[in-house]
Amino acid sequence: MLEKLDLSKKVSKEEYNRQMEVLGERLGKAQRLARDAKRPIIIVFEGWRGARRSALINEMMQQMDARGFNVYSSVRLRGVMQEQPFFGAFWKRLPALGHIVVYHRSWYYLKNANELADKEDNTKYPAVSFEHINNFEKMLTDDNYLVLKFFLHLSPEQQKKNIVKNAKTLGKAWRDLNPAIDESEDYDKFLPHYEKMLEATDTVNAPWHLIADDDPRSARLEVFTKIADAIEKAVQMPAEPAADKRTAATYDVLSTIDANKELTKEEYKEKLDKYQKKLTQLQIEMFKAQIPVVIGFEGWDAAGKGGAIRRLTAALDPLGFHVHPIAAPNVVEKQFHYQWRFWTRLPQPGNIAIFDRTWYGRVMVERIEGFAKPQEWQRAYDEIKDMEAQWSEHGIAIAKFWLQIDKEEQLRRFNDRQADPNKQWKITDEDWRNRDKWDAYEAAVNEMLVRTDTSYAPWTVVEGNNKYYARLKVLKTVIDLFERKLAEKNQ
């Protein structure tokens, strides 16, 4: 790909200034169009060391309103990358609707550094697959993000000139700002690697723009033109991904579950004390092993999620866990991709994040109530599995619970809540409306359980008509998970 670039083309200063008078106005207008259309934009600048990324980005900022975008460098994110899944830092830095985020080196730099740095240094850089990169970018573009990727290509001669010039100008500051792998030491070694990267991640939704950077004026004009063109086109023709075309299937998991499991109060109290003591000790061991945990609870209204969470957390040190109640997204959360609010709540190593309702709302309530378009919730199954796979690969232990009660038991609990002044706060008009849609929700839950049950993030269906049994099953499942992860860690 790179060998096809014409590195000899040049633009005079006069011609550059003439074109920038028009192009600068286009860039400013394009930014305003994106803001008005609430179109979030990510611009990635990659390329050889010595490429003029900083000068290019600075020139672009002069043409736009700096209040509308942020600039980040993955070189400076290395310190926080090891404590979270690879894309965690990038999810936290997503642009809000109508805003722009610019990357002066991005996830591509970190992947290259991991693969090309000396063996004793590559552990400083997190690893990621091309598949996860493509999935990440596709999730964003499917959700109306515009992702623009530029690779600034230099000849080996020009690269050496640029590096020498920068080193003389900035001295030690240049080395401190660029603690990166030094491509200049072996240009021929890095060239095929970059070719492979570009080929593997040049996709329809987020294609690479290859820029000849030996002449900086020519490079800037080409980059700015492509940015203005892309934004103008994106605003005129908003992305509208096709719906999932797979044949509809009927899933039936819940009908095989007998929600009635017997357990006396005496048996419950005896085992509850035993399980909670065990869990207290295991939490300490998980913290020592620095294993993060994500536990998600889903289930029918009045299925007992709150009670199960209380018995679980009663055994835990409050400094080591956080319960995240998930409701409808608020004003801030609506500015981002639906997964954003979960990526930003991931636990630190050794800590536990408990979600009362989860990311699966995308394929349940958002599906049934029409908050997500068909193509949005249909693709969410694969998006969620990819997200959970990334968490698991990072070492996060994942437990997912569906608390199952039958329709008659739910009605009994609803009536009990309405009759008890101390419990009336637990029942809402929305609960009754959801009950009227039982069959639709049941179909959605069945599909969710089948399509997102994986070895790394399996579903546990909890028979919930007997609250005592349900609470103990949750505790025992978490205990088993902790013991298994500790055994794997010690292998």
Positions of predicted regions on the chain:
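Glycine-rich phosphate-binding loop of ATP-dependent small-molecule kinases
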Residues: 1-491
